[in-house]
């Protein structure tokens, strides 16, 4: 596939693949900000962990970030922001039925000619059609209402080259205002392979890879210790493993 890194990227040790997931998420969101994205609404979830962490890194760098528990409410909140500003606002969700909850706002954005950027995390293609938890055909959920639909590599966003990620982000942003149609919603569906969460040194390296100023990384705001600051215990250690399918 054009724009794919060597397949061995997905066979990296866990920490390195988690770092690449975060790098890819940062590169995508940074490219969207360069196109004009200035506001995003985040809904909590495990599969979208890299996107959530990337949004947190970018918040002090010019991105207004809001959080919401309910995806339907989040999408309508973003719709209101987009209507007020005339610029697309991003809504970021996890996989599964979370995506279905975006449909009402997508319909409103479609008929109201309001630009809206709906970004959903997804499981890799290999987990589709085999009974994996929270795995559905979310690619088609919003198809009837969006101006444009795009996907990352089916094996995982981490498998795409930096240039391909940048191009995908630019396509998504331009899709909110197509030259031959009224403005409207777009759906960007992104697969992420486990492990999903990077922290510590991996976070610092991913931030540097995305050409972001690492001296102002909001470590405290993200609940992480600064790399090299000592062997401090993490703020919490949940019992379930968030990097495993089905969580």
Give the role of each language-model region:
Residues 2-247:
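N-terminal alpha/beta PP-like core and its mobile active-site loop of ThDP/TPP-dependent enzymes
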């Amino acid at each position: 596939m054009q724009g794919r890194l060597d397949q061995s990227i997905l066979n990296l040790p866990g920490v390195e693949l988690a770092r690449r997931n975060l790098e890819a998420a940062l590169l995508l969101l940074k490219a969207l900000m360069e196109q004009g994205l200035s506001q995003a609404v985040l809904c909590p979830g495990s599969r979208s962990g890299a996107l959530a962490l990337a949004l947190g890194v970018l918040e002090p760098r010019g991105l207004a970030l809001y959080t919401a528990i309910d995806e339907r409410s989040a999408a309508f909140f973003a719709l209101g922001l987009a209507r007020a500003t005339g610029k697309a606002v991003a809504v970021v969700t996890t996989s599964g039925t979370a995506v279905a909850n975006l449909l009402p706002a997508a319909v409103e954005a479609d008929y109201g000619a309001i630009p809206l950027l709906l970004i959903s995390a997804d499981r890799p293609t290999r987990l589709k059609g085999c009974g994996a938890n929270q795995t559905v055909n979310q690619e088609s959920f919003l198809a009837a209402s969006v101006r444009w639909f795009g996907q990352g590599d089916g094996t995982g966003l981490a498998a795409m080259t930096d240039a391909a990620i940048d191009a995908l982000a630019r396509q998504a942003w331009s899709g909110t205002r197509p030259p031959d149609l009224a403005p409207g919603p777009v759906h960007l569906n992104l697969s992420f392979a486990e492990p999903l969460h990077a922290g510590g040194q991996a976070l610092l390296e991913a931030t540097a890879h995305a050409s972001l100023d690492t001296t102002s990384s909001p470590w405290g705001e993200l609940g992480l210790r600064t790399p090299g600051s000592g062997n401090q215990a993490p703020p919490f250690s949940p019992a379930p493993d968030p990097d495993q399918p089905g969580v």
